[in-house]
Amino acid sequence: MSYTIFSKKKNNQLKEPMFFGQPVNIARYDQQKYKIFEQLIEKQLSFFWRPEEIDLSRDRIDFQNLPDNEKHIFISNLKYQTLLDSIQGRSPNIAFLPIISIPELETWIETWSFSETIHSRSYTHIIRNIVNCPSLVFDDIISNKNIYDRAQNISIYYDELINLTSYWHLLGEGIHLINGKKIHINLRFLKKRLYLCLISVNVLEAIRFYVSFACSFAFAERELMEGNAKIIRLIARDEALHLTGTQHILNLLSNIKNNENMEDVVLECKEEAINIFISAAQQEKKWASYLFKSGSMLGLNKDILCQYIEYITNIRMHAIGFKMPFKKQSNPIPWINDWLTSDNIQIAPQETEISSYLVGQIDSEVSDNEFKKFEL
């Protein structure tokens, strides 16, 4: 199927599937097949923020006074988060936009990816405010085996979908000889790669950030690195929205009532999808061991983090219809919810930067019915 950025063929976008239908031509929002994506877009736009709004001058002093094992925890997490959001700042656009068929999903993907670039900029803002030579931190990201191994598990699903989609657009379905290698292209196989890629992205948003989040908030609970925690809190708020987006996409694909023609694919890929979740949980436990190899920090250690990983993995898998792989348990670090739920804490504006504000949340549309109860 040849791809075009503007299809001249008139179609009814309400009857198009989310993926692998006719490419989007007119970006219209007066009619929507799935209104949830418009709601996500509006919410993300209301969240807009810039890392430069947060003062990190105190964090530099705090960081210099941290023991070496806590400096290792702090910097290692920033490196890993930089890698994750470097991937997420570009990959959803490259992988999903060429195969999306409805405008509201197309715009949500673009809005989502843009917000990830703000996260990447945030890590640079944090790092250059606490160390004298940021290049030493960034240059180590690719060469650090503990980070590199996890990156491979994330990028492989994106890369495979992107490559196969390119072949499909250029050559169509069939068996093709490319550089001496036979490539089998068919729509059903593409749908499988799409579903597994979406699962991998869901896992990234659902699990992979939360070890780093927990460590950042644990520092702030001790009134250390508080500027960093404010930025991470804004990032966590965004990531929760992105997680909601991927969960909705996956649940819509698996619901037979939506006519997405993916039910069989979902069933066939279920075992591999579950393995992606479990594998990610094990990798995050390994990462926790790496972080705390030289000692724990006050309020958090490897064992507690591993319990938390199992706890959130159960919740995330249940949210998309999978069975919980680990023993059911309560949240081992309940205080983290105060940081992950942005409305829980009231702060006087003159005391600190507010990290829970929303932009453009006033509804300016007023109907005649609003005035019926008024009497002159």
Swiss-Prot record:
Keywords (A to Z) from UniProt: Deoxyribonucleotide synthesis, Iron, Metal-binding, Oxidoreductase
EC nos: 1.17.4.1
Cofactor or coenzyme needed: Fe cation
Cofactor note: Binds 2 iron ions per subunit.
GO molecular function: metal ion binding; ribonucleoside-diphosphate reductase activity, thioredoxin disulfide as acceptor
Assembly: Tetramer of two alpha and two beta subunits.
Protein name: Ribonucleoside-diphosphate reductase subunit beta
Source taxonomy: Bacteria, Pseudomonadati, Pseudomonadota, Gammaproteobacteria, Enterobacterales
Gene: nrdB
